[in-house]
Amino acid sequence: MKAVFFDLDDTLLWDEKSVRTTFAETCLQAEKKYGLAPEEFEAAVREAARELYMSYETYPYTVMIGINPFEGLWSNFSEPISEGFQKLNKIVPEYRRNAWTNGLKALGIDDPAYGEYLGEFFAAERRKRPFVYDETFAVLDQLKGKYELLLLTNGDPSLQKEKLAGVPELAPYFNEIVISGAFGKGKPDVSIFEHCLKLMNIEKDDAIMVGDNLNTDILGASRAGIKTVWINRTDKKNETDVKPDYIISSLHDLFPILEK
């Protein structure tokens, strides 16, 4: 084994915690102003965001690149590298405003100005909340020098770069960083994995992919003939047809696999 490919969100960075705590803080503002139950309001906003996101002409593009509705609640899509990102950049202020406004409306509150305020509050608050898993740096320290390391992440290039800038120690570990929005297709498309192999100048048998998402990280790498490690920290049940080669609950569990 010569190279380890890592996913970013919820593999090295604890993105779920960032989103969860940002929603909690933002919904607390609405509880203070309107007495809304935070959990109920969050559910309403998440549903409103999903519906809106799917209604835009850019939706198929975001699916291809691998950008979810909640990334759109704080991304500015500020790199005009394609027509898709140019459109997203124009749409996103309205999307943010309406997602929160429609969430309020679902609970009987008609206040577009406050919806806009919450949209901006959420985006600013999310930027303050980069979380890294406890074991991330210890594991990367042990791997660096022994293996070539590549970071493969789906998303908007401007946003993924911003996440990395929020944890500046992370990027220097990697020989290459590949972001789906810059490449033009996202995981699980085989082409992005083949691109990574070419970048690293290695064969598929010399790499292993580590990620938390069965339908993107594991499926795509498997299709490309790359060995896969599903990191499943919360003991989720695999309800897909995707079969990872290995399953771990901590990044520390990688070492016995790599030493085989």
From Swiss-Prot:
Pathway given in the UniProt record: Amino-acid biosynthesis; L-serine biosynthesis; L-serine from 3-phospho-D-glycerate: step 3/3
EC number: 3.1.3.3
Effect of deleting the gene: Cells lacking this gene cannot grow in minimal medium, in contrast to wild type. ysaA, serA, and serC deletion mutants have virtually identical profiles when observed across all the conditions studied, likely placing YsaA in the serine biosynthesis pathway. The defect is complemented by glycine, or a combination of serine and other amino acids such as glutamine or glutamate. The inability of serine alone to rescue the growth defect of the deletion mutant is due to serine toxicity.
UniProt entry keywords in alphabetical sequence: Amino-acid biosynthesis, Cobalt, Hydrolase, Magnesium, Serine biosynthesis
One of the GO biological process terms: L-serine biosynthetic process
Superkingdom of origin: Bacteria
GO molecular function: L-phosphoserine phosphatase activity; phosphatase activity
Catalytic activity: O-phospho-L-serine + H2O = L-serine + phosphate; O-phospho-D-serine + H2O = D-serine + phosphate
CDD domains according to UniProt: HAD_Neu5Ac-Pase_like
A Pfam family assignment: Hydrolase
Endoplasmic reticulum recorded as keyword: no
InterPro entries: HAD-like_hydrolase (IPR051400), HAD-like_sf (IPR036412), HAD-SF_hydro_IA (IPR006439), HAD_sf (IPR023214), PGP-like_dom2 (IPR023198), PSP_YsaA (IPR044266)
Name of the top EC class for this enzyme: hydrolase
Cofactor section: Mg(2+); Co(2+)
Record-stated family: Belongs to the HAD-like hydrolase superfamily.
Other remarks in the entry: ysaA complements E.coli serB and vice versa.
Function: Catalyzes the last step of the phosphorylated serine biosynthetic pathway, i.e. dephosphorylation of O-phospho-L-serine to form L-serine. To a lesser extent, is also able to dephosphorylate phosphothreonine, phosphoethanolamine, and histidinol phosphate in vitro.
PANTHER family: N-ACYLNEURAMINATE-9-PHOSPHATASE
Name this polypeptide is given: Phosphoserine phosphatase
